Amino acid sequence: MERQPCREKFGLKRGPWTEEEDQKLTSYVLKNGIQGWRVIPKLAGLSRCGKSCRLRWMNYLRPDLKKGPLTEMEENQIIELHAHLGNRWSKIALHIPGRTDNEIKNYWNTHIKKKLKLLGIDPNNHQPFEHKGNVDETKIESDTKESNSQDMKQIVNEVSRQGNNDQITESTSPEIKDEIVTSCQSDYLMHNNDLMSNRSSNYYSPSFSMEESLSNPKSTGQTSFAVSIHEESMKQWVQSVDSKLPWDCFNQLDEQLYLSFQQNQSNS
């Protein structure tokens, strides 16, 4: 059998309670007690439903209600009860006399919950939060593993490019794979070292060293100045030479100079 709603369609008042209604309800309950909230409105002369009268009495009018903020002892008691009961505010209110479930719920959301978060405690399970440093360390380890795996893939690809892809197959044992990868790593490092040495040697001139430039800084400027003058003179000479001039005459001149040089050597 379904329960009939306590509020009728017409004739019931809604909205905030007045002082007159509070006095009627308080005087009736204190005189006759709580017999049943469905019949109290009619007996007390109120145009309210039973649920509205019950909530008004339990949350505002009963004489054992405590006024003012919750004490520190009540706050600790709420935390302990919440750890066992969770968000069952009506059951928590039964263990704290003079406080309503609505008052306890509001105080939890506005004060206790924020306080626990500042202390590093999760208000849902009352356990300390996980340290962010541990999460960062695990992240770094995972990133390192990923980078190592990428390096290994590059090495295997390098082996396949060199034509050694037949050496590594699915049936190859792990020991042989490690040896092949190690040899590839050494070859790869030697190749990189050779490239770096060649690149570094290109920065030095055969007729000019870094030690000389450090010991005599003036020589650096003089040498660069002389080289620039020589280059400019060569450019001017090439531009001034006639393009139709036969180059065979220079070969004959070279032979004559060579013969004269040999004669001088024989005479001496």
Curated annotation (Swiss-Prot):
<keyword id="KW-0539">Nucleus</keyword>
<protein>
    <recommendedName>
        <fullName>Myb-related protein 315</fullName>
    </recommendedName>
</protein>
<dbReference type="GO" id="GO:0003677">
    <property type="term" value="F:DNA binding"/>
</dbReference>
<feature type="domain" description="HTH myb-type 1">
    <location>
        <begin position="9"/>
        <end position="61"/>
    </location>
</feature>
<keyword id="KW-0677">Repeat</keyword>
<dbReference type="Pfam" id="PF00249">
    <property type="entry name" value="Myb_DNA-binding"/>
</dbReference>
<feature type="domain" description="HTH myb-type 2">
    <location>
        <begin position="62"/>
        <end position="116"/>
    </location>
</feature>
<dbReference type="InterPro" id="IPR001005">
    <property type="entry name" value="SANT/Myb"/>
</dbReference>
<feature type="DNA-binding region" description="H-T-H motif">
    <location>
        <begin position="37"/>
        <end position="61"/>
    </location>
</feature>
<dbReference type="InterPro" id="IPR015495">
    <property type="entry name" value="Myb_TF_plants"/>
</dbReference>
<dbReference type="GO" id="GO:0005634">
    <property type="term" value="C:nucleus"/>
</dbReference>
<keyword id="KW-0804">Transcription</keyword>
<comment type="function">
    <text>Transcription factor.</text>
</comment>
<keyword id="KW-0238">DNA-binding</keyword>
<dbReference type="InterPro" id="IPR017930">
    <property type="entry name" value="Myb_dom"/>
</dbReference>
<feature type="DNA-binding region" description="H-T-H motif">
    <location>
        <begin position="89"/>
        <end position="112"/>
    </location>
</feature>
<dbReference type="InterPro" id="IPR009057">
    <property type="entry name" value="Homeodomain-like_sf"/>
</dbReference>
<keyword id="KW-0805">Transcription regulation</keyword>
